[in-house]
Amino acid sequence: MVNKEEAQRLKELGNKCFQEGKYEEAVKYFSDAITNDPLDHVLYSNLSGAFASLGRFYEALESANKCISIKKDWPKGYIRKGCAEHGLRQLSNAEKTYLEGLKIDPNNKSLQDALSKVRNENMLENAQLIAHLNNIIENDPQLKSYKEENSNYPHELLNTIKSINSNPMNIRIILSTCHPKISEGVEKFFGFKFTGEGNDAEERQRQQREEEERRKKKEEEERKKKEEEEMKKQNRTPEQIQGDEHKLKVMN
């Protein structure tokens, strides 16, 4: 049931916490406010900002997308989305988002400044990546031969790597559409293969090892907890023990 008054009350509490730097509490208040008014775009914007302040950029992006889906003509939604993408280092995506916002409000100073900043970072990152890629290529005879065949090879490789960084969940799809020479360069850039049954088996083994480590860690924590409880029992005073015995008699 929609309760706008309660949503407004919770929103104000969330804003107060946000201003005080209590971002976890702000997330809770904004989330509770959304429960009371799930179609208020401002609440999703505020929630996105709180998540971003905590470095939880995937959640910030999700909230920003929801904000935009409710109110597409609100510039601040695009600021929130671009900020989340920036935090995820999806610089090309952030640039596109800020440009979308500027179509709605061409004179928005916040969008203009954010776009300028992300473009500068994108250029710097591209230069650093190209330098790193050229170093890899020069030290790999096979990749070096690809560059000799195609002088644009490093830039094609760069574009694919940036696509993967922007859409890491789609890495297999991206690589499946690439020329094999690009896929090979990408795998050498990241230092491991992404395709093939052998790699799937390696990934499963890695997951199994991690699961086993988590299980052992949990067992160790439980063992230590039991030991601490036993030590506490052994260190109890006579008065505490008599008190427990008295409680048992009363219960019986």
From Swiss-Prot:
The keyword Coiled coil applies. GO terms for molecular function: Hsp90 protein binding. InterPro entries: TPR-like_helical_dom_sf, TPR_rpt. It is found in: Cytoplasm. One of its GO terms (cellular component) is cytoplasm. The TPR repeats form 3 domains; the TPR 1 domain is composed of TPR 1, 2 and 3 repeats, the TPR2A domain of TPR 4, 5 and 6 repeats and TPR2B domain of TPR 7, 8 and 9 repeats. The lineage of its organism: Eukaryota, Sar, Alveolata, Apicomplexa, Aconoidasida. The gene is HOP. SUPFAM superfamilies: TPR-like (SSF48452). Acts as a co-chaperone and mediates the association of the chaperones HSP70 and HSP90 probably facilitating substrate transfer from HSP70 to HSP90. Stimulates HSP70 ATPase activity and, in contrast, inhibits HSP90 ATPase activity. Residues 199-252 are annotated as: Disordered. It comes from the Eukaryota. Pfam families: TPR_8. Its main location: cytoplasm. Residues 197-239 form a coiled coil. Keywords: Chaperone, Coiled coil, Cytoplasm, Repeat, TPR repeat. This is Hsp70-Hsp90 organising protein. Monomer. Homodimer. Forms a complex composed of HOP and chaperones HSP70 and HSP90; the interaction is stronger in the absence of ATP. Interacts (via TPR 1, 2, 3, 7, 8 and 9 repeats) with HSP70 (via C-terminus); the interaction is direct and is stronger in the absence of ATP. Interacts (via TPR 4, 5 and 6 repeats) with HSP90 (via C-terminus); the interaction is direct. Gene3D superfamilies: Tetratricopeptide repeat domain. TPR repeats lie at residues 7-40, 41-74, 75-108.
